[in-house]
């Protein structure tokens, strides 16, 4: 790992405290110009929102500030109830977040919570009126803070991740301080369901978009290459073999049946092989996901 990349992953708690004490973003509503996301943080978010479809789900991102960039190093899901159009964090989710952050520190992961993410299944990445108010409250009390939105359905149907990162303007300054470079990308509000057009347009001046780039360590690169060479959408969305009780139960019944039939010479070995082939293929697929899902994505 080169020094520049190593520095991205290194977290200096004292330096981070100094940046927060200085808080230059309080004097410049457009202080932050970009967001950088690690590969594992992105995959964890994508896995969570994909498995949550068709409901909206949410979580937090952890990381640090580097110049005018917010660096997202990790993410974790929140146990919140969502609907097909809205998700809200309750007190239990806040308690969970505090406990999770405490446990992270106990294993020397000191990165701060620097934002939240949630999903917009099949209606793009932008901030609704509720999202804008939530983000404004977060920036008021927890800054630095960024809002990340992912569309899992569109992501799984295309070769790229449908994602956006946003920060809100202070109340009363909507759009009046925006520079030309901060306007939303034209693609942001394309192909919206008719029920979402009004909400999306009504609050577009209340926030700005931040360009997103990605980075990965050598270990993370192996994960992304693994997914690229396989059916990545299936690997992301399906439960692991350790969680698929129905598959395990059906496989156990099939194996018991084949052992009984072949043991009593009632079924030729060739026939037993043919009957078990589908099960073996499915098992092979699930086994290929264990390292990725149950080790690298384990929360």
From Swiss-Prot:
Zn(2+) binds at residues 118, 120, 131. Its main location: cytoplasm. Transmembrane segments: none annotated. Keywords: Cytoplasm, Hydrolase, Metal-binding, Metalloprotease, Nucleus, Protease, Signalosome, Zinc. A motif (JAMM motif) lies at residues 118-131. GO terms for biological process: protein deneddylation; proteolysis; regulation of cell cycle. One of its GO terms (cellular component) is cytosol. This is COP9 signalosome complex subunit 5. It comes from Schizosaccharomyces pombe (strain 972 / ATCC 24843) (Fission yeast). The gene is csn5.
């Amino acid at each position: 790992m080169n020094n520049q990349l190593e520095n991205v992953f290194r977290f200096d708690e004292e330096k981070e405290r100094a940046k927060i004490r200085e808080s230059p973003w309080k004097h410049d509503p457009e202080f932050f110009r970009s967001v950088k996301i690690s590969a594992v943080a992105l995959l964890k978010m994508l896995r969570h929102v994909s498995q949550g479809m068709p409901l909206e789900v949410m979580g937090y991102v952890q990381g640090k500030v580097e110049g005018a960039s917010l660096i997202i190093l990790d993410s974790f899901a929140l146990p919140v109830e969502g609907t097909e159009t809205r998700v809200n964090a309750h007190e239990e989710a806040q308690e969970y977040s505090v406990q999770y952050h405490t446990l992270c520190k106990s294993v020397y992961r000191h990165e701060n919570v620097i934002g939240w993410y949630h999903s917009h299944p099949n209606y793009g990445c932008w901030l609704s009126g509720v999202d804008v108010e939530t983000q404004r409250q977060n920036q008021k009390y927890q800054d630095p803070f960024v809002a990340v939105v992912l569309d899992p359905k569109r992501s799984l149907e295309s070769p790229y991740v449908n994602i956006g990162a946003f920060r809100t303007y202070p109340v009363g300054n909507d759009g009046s301080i925006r520079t030309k470079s901060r306007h939303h990308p034209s693609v942001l509000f394309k192909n919206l369901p008719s029920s979402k057009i009004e909400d999306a347009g009504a609050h577009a001046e209340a926030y700005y978009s931040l360009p997103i780039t990605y980075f990965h360590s050598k270990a993370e690169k192996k994960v992304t290459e693994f997914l690229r060479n396989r059916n990545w959408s299936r690997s992301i969305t399906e439960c692991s073999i350790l969680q698929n009780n129905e598959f395990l139960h059906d496989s156990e019944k099939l194996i018991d049946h084949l052992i009984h039939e072949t043991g009593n010479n009632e079924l030729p070995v060739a026939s037993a092989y043919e009957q078990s082939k589908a099960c073996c293929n499915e098992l092979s697929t699930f086994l290929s996901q264990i390292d990725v899902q149950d080790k690298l994505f384990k929360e």
